[in-house]
Amino acid sequence: MNADVHKNDPASPGTWEAASALAGKFMTFKLGNEEYGIEILKVREIIGLMEITRVPRVTPWIRGVINLRGKVVPVVDLRVKFGMSPTAATEQTVIIVVQCAIGGRELTMGILVDQVLEVLPLEASQIEPPPSFGTAEVDAGFILGVAKAEKRVIFLLDIGKVLSASEALEMATAQTAQA
């Protein structure tokens, strides 16, 4: 093994210290064949797919807005945001409503996912640091870590970092445009 492989790896030489802070319950879901998780405390509710009103002139990953009990909530298509094809509506497609801080603002948004799997309790020993992509220009700052559960690999997302501050502003603009 190359000696430089773990040079900046927080997991070397011992255990990854941040794993204990990440241990807890995660809502897991699928996008395509990949499995992701977000901290359960960020999840407000899960709703079935409903009519999403398109907002003109917004980024393609902003699917639109929904009326959730009188409140206008922007909806992000995570598949598109992550460079996949748009989410197709199936019986398992849902919107996970989350609350997070982005760019210093509290934001409620919906994230469109292919399927919710389970609430998964994770221990520190099951969580590894985000993968290093070497010198490749890959923005993986939104990945908290990678969990190993049974034979599955789950990318743990920092939902507050999936969007940049400017993208959050665009979301807020989409939200107020339809209010």
Predicted regions, residues:
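An acidic, low-aromatic, low-complexity terminal/linker signal
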Residues: 1-179
